[in-house]
């Protein structure tokens, strides 16, 4: 009944993965991002992640895997996602939704920390403001994005961009795979002396 749809969906995802893998710069950027995050942990710094909607879920998942466990038991790593609903509703109400991430970074971000900003379109104003605030704090910025990276293009230290201009779910599927690979490499880097 729906087999054609199922095959079509998997084929579409496969093509996006294939196109991404052909861009060697993106593969290099994943490696650079993982090494940068591991180095920040070794320097007793933290990573702060943020995103909206499905990207918010990815940001939470990223910090959960780092503070808890991925594939093997190990010590937790200092990762925070900007996800507290009371905080988000308070700042959204008092200052505006565009400041929910930047005010958090203003409060807890420090030199040497890292911001992982996730946006499928690259056009969310609250993500742009988060990046700007992180730069003021002399934090390093890594972005996971899609399409053509939108307004956040060239604002980060490391940009990982999924070359897809269709539905955002395809970009999110790639983002979660990238997040898992980042964590895997971070763990390997943290085992080095």
Swiss-Prot record:
<dbReference type="GO" id="GO:0005737">
    <property type="term" value="C:cytoplasm"/>
</dbReference>
<keyword id="KW-0119">Carbohydrate metabolism</keyword>
<comment type="similarity">
    <text>Belongs to the SIS family. GmhA subfamily.</text>
</comment>
<dbReference type="GO" id="GO:0008270">
    <property type="term" value="F:zinc ion binding"/>
</dbReference>
<dbReference type="Pfam" id="PF13580">
    <property type="entry name" value="SIS_2"/>
</dbReference>
<dbReference type="GO" id="GO:0097367">
    <property type="term" value="F:carbohydrate derivative binding"/>
</dbReference>
<dbReference type="GO" id="GO:2001061">
    <property type="term" value="P:D-glycero-D-manno-heptose 7-phosphate biosynthetic process"/>
</dbReference>
<keyword id="KW-0963">Cytoplasm</keyword>
<feature type="binding site">
    <location>
        <position position="172"/>
    </location>
    <ligand>
        <name>Zn(2+)</name>
    </ligand>
</feature>
<feature type="binding site">
    <location>
        <position position="65"/>
    </location>
    <ligand>
        <name>substrate</name>
    </ligand>
</feature>
<feature type="binding site">
    <location>
        <begin position="52"/>
        <end position="54"/>
    </location>
    <ligand>
        <name>substrate</name>
    </ligand>
</feature>
<keyword id="KW-0479">Metal-binding</keyword>
<feature type="binding site">
    <location>
        <position position="180"/>
    </location>
    <ligand>
        <name>Zn(2+)</name>
    </ligand>
</feature>
<dbReference type="GO" id="GO:0005975">
    <property type="term" value="P:carbohydrate metabolic process"/>
</dbReference>
<feature type="binding site">
    <location>
        <position position="124"/>
    </location>
    <ligand>
        <name>substrate</name>
    </ligand>
</feature>
<dbReference type="InterPro" id="IPR046348">
    <property type="entry name" value="SIS_dom_sf"/>
</dbReference>
<feature type="binding site">
    <location>
        <position position="65"/>
    </location>
    <ligand>
        <name>Zn(2+)</name>
    </ligand>
</feature>
<feature type="binding site">
    <location>
        <begin position="93"/>
        <end position="94"/>
    </location>
    <ligand>
        <name>substrate</name>
    </ligand>
</feature>
<feature type="binding site">
    <location>
        <position position="61"/>
    </location>
    <ligand>
        <name>Zn(2+)</name>
    </ligand>
</feature>
<dbReference type="GO" id="GO:0008968">
    <property type="term" value="F:D-sedoheptulose 7-phosphate isomerase activity"/>
</dbReference>
<comment type="subunit">
    <text>Homotetramer.</text>
</comment>
<feature type="binding site">
    <location>
        <position position="172"/>
    </location>
    <ligand>
        <name>substrate</name>
    </ligand>
</feature>
<feature type="domain" description="SIS">
    <location>
        <begin position="37"/>
        <end position="193"/>
    </location>
</feature>
<feature type="binding site">
    <location>
        <begin position="119"/>
        <end position="121"/>
    </location>
    <ligand>
        <name>substrate</name>
    </ligand>
</feature>
<comment type="function">
    <text>Catalyzes the isomerization of sedoheptulose 7-phosphate in D-glycero-D-manno-heptose 7-phosphate.</text>
</comment>
<keyword id="KW-0862">Zinc</keyword>
<keyword id="KW-0413">Isomerase</keyword>
<dbReference type="InterPro" id="IPR035461">
    <property type="entry name" value="GmhA/DiaA"/>
</dbReference>
<protein>
    <recommendedName>
        <fullName>Phosphoheptose isomerase</fullName>
        <ecNumber>5.3.1.28</ecNumber>
    </recommendedName>
</protein>
<dbReference type="InterPro" id="IPR004515">
    <property type="entry name" value="Phosphoheptose_Isoase"/>
</dbReference>
<comment type="pathway">
    <text>Carbohydrate biosynthesis; D-glycero-D-manno-heptose 7-phosphate biosynthesis; D-glycero-alpha-D-manno-heptose 7-phosphate and D-glycero-beta-D-manno-heptose 7-phosphate from sedoheptulose 7-phosphate: step 1/1.</text>
</comment>
<dbReference type="InterPro" id="IPR050099">
    <property type="entry name" value="SIS_GmhA/DiaA_subfam"/>
</dbReference>
<dbReference type="InterPro" id="IPR001347">
    <property type="entry name" value="SIS_dom"/>
</dbReference>
